[in-house]
Amino acid sequence: VNNPNQLARVKSFFEDVPSHAKITTGGKQVSRDGFFIEPTVIADLKQGDRHIQEEIFGPVITVQKFKDEAEAIKLANGVVYGLASSVWTSNHSRAMRLAKAFDFGCVWINCHIPVVAEMPHGGYKRSGYGKDLSAYGFEDYTRIKHVMTNLGA
């Protein structure tokens, strides 16, 4: 992470894991020199948990179980933020259906955070306004106007 305040914030998510959930890997600061945190997976979270409802902005993936695609969509979209999500499945058709239904600015399939300059990056809902990266990022800095004249008049 990029500063001591964010380090403390991310670590607070590790200290606040509910009893029904568990850190399956990671969850520790790598060293006291710098602001490095192990890549972390927190599993068995519930919809109301802080880890699901807030943006962590650290090397953390949260995992929820679901019964069917309808429930997966309801859980994923049942948050006020919408920056990014990921779908993990061996069924590509399912992944595409879920990606289309998820209300997030970025949906990654079988990966997480592969940000590239050629693709727009930015969220929906309370996760920011507009896009950065790619040609779409320029639209936030432009004001389009249509002007037409009849030169024969």
Predicted regions located by residue number:
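Short beta-strand to alpha-helix junction loop
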Residues: 1-11
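Poly-acidic low-complexity segments
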Residues: 3, 30-31
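Helical element adjacent to the flavin cofactor pocket in flavoenzyme catalytic cores
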Residues: 12-20
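Short secondary-structure junctions
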Residues: 20-27
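Conserved C-terminal structural/oligomerization subdomain of aldehyde/semialdehyde dehydrogenase
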Residues: 29, 36-153
